């Protein structure tokens, strides 16, 4: 059974902009951690780790193989690897949230880069939520945020990871095509509908790539063409950073995306670890 590890596909109604697999294409296979939260609800990596590990444990207990599909490299690592989360401090968090609102995500990311360049290099400058969390951890622990990131050690050893390798020009083109398809398929209407469900109040969902750009368009801050262009740019940058995460993991078996024997090779990798 499938276990989603995409940070934004957990939200109900965020379908087009997250490229969520439609129910008709799931072929009757159970998919877990899709459409779990309303767009108003915040979600953290620590919460997601608990949810996903509980699902994996339940599947294991009944002899079903969990297939994690993502998505978000940090979320996947949090589920697979030994990863203990630092505590939280609501007062410290609130102060950094207020600073984020006052100076914006780019300036806050610059400050993080001064304190912990490694952590800053792993997250997008516009991801204010993660920057706030990193600064909170640094202040609470007195240590770099990067020191709290997961080690390359499986929490559940019988695990195999497979990645699809693709050249950057092809990936960039596919991202541009996918963004165009999302807008053509009704991303703007989806965001308008989600506004009625509280997207603007959602601390996590409102910051998703594509949704924040469309929000800027609907508020008159961007033209539609600019919203498309910025979504393409942000997605490409996100993809590069995700690749930066995964390329450093020697446990991942990479298979060319256009390999005619892709499925057979993937099954062989899984079989060799059984």
PLM regions: where:
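Phosphate/pyrophosphate-binding catalytic cores of soluble transferases and nucleic-acid-acting enzymes
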Residues: 1-274
């Amino acid at each position: 059974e499938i276990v989603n590890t995409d940070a934004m596909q957990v939200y109900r109604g965020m379908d087009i902009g997250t490229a969520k697999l439609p129910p008709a294409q799931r072929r009757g296979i159970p998919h877990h951690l899709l459409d779990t939260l309303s767009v108003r609800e915040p979600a953290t990596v620590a919460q997601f780790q608990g949810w996903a590990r509980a699902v994996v444990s339940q599947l294991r207990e009944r002899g079903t193989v969990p297939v994690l599909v993502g998505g978000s490299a940090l979320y996947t690592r949090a589920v697979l690897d030994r990863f203990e989360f630092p505590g939280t401090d609501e007062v410290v968090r609130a102060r950094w949230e207020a600073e984020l609102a006052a100076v914006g995500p780019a300036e806050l990311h610059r400050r993080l880069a001064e304190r912990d360049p490694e952590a800053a290099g792993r997250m997008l400058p516009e991801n204010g939520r993660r920057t706030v969390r990193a600064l909170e951890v640094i202040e609470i622990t007195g240590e770099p945020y990067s020191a709290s990131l997961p080690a390359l050690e499986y929490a559940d050893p019988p695990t195999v990871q497979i990645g699809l390798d693709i050249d950057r020009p092809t990936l960039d083109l596919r991202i541009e095509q996918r963004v165009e398809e999302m807008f053509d398929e009704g991303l703007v209407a989806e965001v308008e509908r989600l506004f009625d469900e509280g997207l603007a109040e959602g601390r996590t969902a409102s910051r998703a790539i594509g949704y924040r750009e469309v929000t800027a368009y609907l508020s008159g801050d961007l033209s539609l063409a600019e919203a498309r262009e910025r979504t393409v740019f942000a997605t490409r940058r996100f993809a590069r950073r995700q690749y930066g995460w995964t390329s450093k993991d020697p446990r991942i078996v990479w298979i060319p995306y256009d390999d005619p024997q892709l499925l057979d090779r993937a099954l062989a990798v899984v079989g060799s670890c059984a």
